[in-house]
Amino acid sequence: MITIKAEVRNDQGKGASRRLRAANKFPAIIYGGSEAAIAIELDHDTTKNLELKPGFYDNTGLTLVINGKETKVKVQAVQRHAFKPKLTHIDFVRI
Protein backbone atom coordinates (compact mmCIF):
# COMPACT_ATOMS: atom_id res chain seq x y z
CA MET A 1 0.00 0.00 0.00
CA ILE A 2 1.40 3.36 -1.03
CA THR A 3 0.89 6.31 1.34
CA ILE A 4 1.31 9.94 0.28
CA LYS A 5 1.31 12.96 2.59
CA ALA A 6 -0.77 15.87 1.27
CA GLU A 7 -1.82 19.31 2.47
CA VAL A 8 -5.10 21.15 1.89
CA ARG A 9 -4.82 24.05 -0.57
CA ASN A 10 -6.22 27.39 0.51
CA ASP A 11 -5.43 29.37 -2.64
CA GLN A 12 -6.75 28.28 -6.01
CA GLY A 13 -6.38 29.51 -9.55
CA LYS A 14 -3.64 29.83 -12.14
CA GLY A 15 -1.35 32.08 -10.09
CA ALA A 16 -1.58 29.91 -6.98
CA SER A 17 -0.87 26.77 -9.04
CA ARG A 18 2.16 28.39 -10.63
CA ARG A 19 3.50 29.39 -7.21
CA LEU A 20 3.06 25.78 -6.04
CA ARG A 21 4.95 24.44 -9.04
CA ALA A 22 7.75 26.96 -8.48
CA ALA A 23 8.01 25.60 -4.90
CA ASN A 24 8.40 22.02 -6.27
CA LYS A 25 4.80 21.10 -5.42
CA PHE A 26 1.74 20.67 -7.61
CA PRO A 27 -2.05 20.83 -7.21
CA ALA A 28 -4.38 17.86 -7.04
CA ILE A 29 -8.02 17.21 -6.20
CA ILE A 30 -9.95 14.46 -4.43
CA TYR A 31 -13.60 13.91 -5.35
CA GLY A 32 -16.28 11.25 -5.28
CA GLY A 33 -18.28 9.60 -2.56
CA SER A 34 -20.58 11.54 -0.26
CA GLU A 35 -17.99 14.13 0.81
CA ALA A 36 -17.23 17.40 -0.96
CA ALA A 37 -14.23 17.75 -3.27
CA ILE A 38 -10.95 18.69 -1.57
CA ALA A 39 -8.21 20.70 -3.28
CA ILE A 40 -4.80 19.48 -2.11
CA GLU A 41 -1.12 20.03 -2.83
CA LEU A 42 1.52 17.32 -3.17
CA ASP A 43 5.31 17.33 -3.14
CA HIS A 44 6.46 16.78 -6.72
CA ASP A 45 9.61 14.71 -6.19
CA THR A 46 8.03 12.38 -3.64
CA THR A 47 4.97 11.77 -5.81
CA LYS A 48 7.06 11.33 -8.97
CA ASN A 49 9.17 8.65 -7.24
CA LEU A 50 6.07 6.88 -5.91
CA GLU A 51 4.48 6.99 -9.36
CA LEU A 52 7.20 4.66 -10.64
CA LYS A 53 6.34 1.99 -8.07
CA PRO A 54 4.04 -0.87 -9.02
CA GLY A 55 0.63 -0.32 -7.51
CA PHE A 56 0.42 3.46 -7.97
CA TYR A 57 -2.16 3.09 -10.75
CA ASP A 58 -3.78 -0.12 -9.48
CA ASN A 59 -7.44 -0.23 -8.53
CA THR A 60 -6.41 -1.31 -5.03
CA GLY A 61 -5.75 2.36 -4.40
CA LEU A 62 -3.47 4.67 -2.50
CA THR A 63 -3.73 6.23 0.93
CA LEU A 64 -3.54 10.02 1.18
CA VAL A 65 -2.81 11.47 4.62
CA ILE A 66 -4.35 14.94 4.88
CA ASN A 67 -3.99 16.70 8.24
CA GLY A 68 -3.62 13.33 9.97
CA LYS A 69 -6.74 11.85 8.36
CA GLU A 70 -6.31 8.92 5.99
CA THR A 71 -8.34 8.83 2.78
CA LYS A 72 -8.31 5.83 0.43
CA VAL A 73 -8.23 6.93 -3.22
CA LYS A 74 -7.28 5.79 -6.70
CA VAL A 75 -5.77 7.80 -9.53
CA GLN A 76 -8.40 9.00 -12.00
CA ALA A 77 -6.36 11.32 -14.26
CA VAL A 78 -2.79 12.61 -14.49
CA GLN A 79 -1.68 15.74 -16.30
CA ARG A 80 1.96 16.13 -17.28
CA HIS A 81 4.12 18.91 -18.66
CA ALA A 82 4.38 18.80 -22.46
CA PHE A 83 8.14 18.17 -22.66
CA LYS A 84 9.56 18.21 -19.11
CA PRO A 85 9.35 15.13 -16.88
CA LYS A 86 6.98 16.93 -14.49
CA LEU A 87 3.54 16.18 -13.09
CA THR A 88 1.24 19.21 -13.26
CA HIS A 89 -2.01 17.87 -11.73
CA ILE A 90 -3.59 14.64 -10.49
CA ASP A 91 -7.27 13.80 -9.99
CA PHE A 92 -8.01 11.25 -7.27
CA VAL A 93 -11.36 9.56 -6.73
CA ARG A 94 -12.38 8.15 -3.33
CA ILE A 95 -12.89 4.41 -3.06
Curated annotation (Swiss-Prot):
Keywords: Ribonucleoprotein, Ribosomal protein, RNA-binding, rRNA-binding. HAMAP family: Ribosomal_bL25. This is one of the proteins that binds to the 5S RNA in the ribosome where it forms part of the central protuberance. GO terms for molecular function: 5S rRNA binding; structural constituent of ribosome. CDD domains: Ribosomal_L25_TL5_CTC. InterPro entries: Rbsml_bL25/Gln-tRNA_synth_N, Ribosomal_bL25/Gln-tRNA_synth, Ribosomal_bL25_short, Ribosomal_L25_dom, Ribosomal_uL5_bac-type. GO terms for cellular component: cytosolic large ribosomal subunit. Part of the 50S ribosomal subunit; part of the 5S rRNA/L5/L18/L25 subcomplex. Contacts the 5S rRNA. Binds to the 5S rRNA independently of L5 and L18. It holds the Pfam family Ribosomal_L25p. Signal peptide: none annotated. GO terms for biological process: translation. Belongs to the bacterial ribosomal protein bL25 family. This is Large ribosomal subunit protein bL25.
